[in-house]
C-alpha cells in the first residue's frame, strides 16, 4: 500500500504502519525531516509544503494521513 504521511514531524504516527508499505512523508521543517529520515530510512521524505504536495500528488496514494 502506498501511504502519504502529511505534516510528518518526527513520525510519531508512522509507528502505526509496518515496513511493507511504501511511505512518503512530507515535512516543512528541514531539521525535522532529517530526524524523520534517521528514524525511518526506508521512507521517502519530502521537504516542502504538505498541502501543495497533496494537491499535486493525491492520486498516487492508496491512503493519506493528515
Model-derived features: positions:
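Conserved active-site and SAM-binding loop architecture
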Residues: 1-66
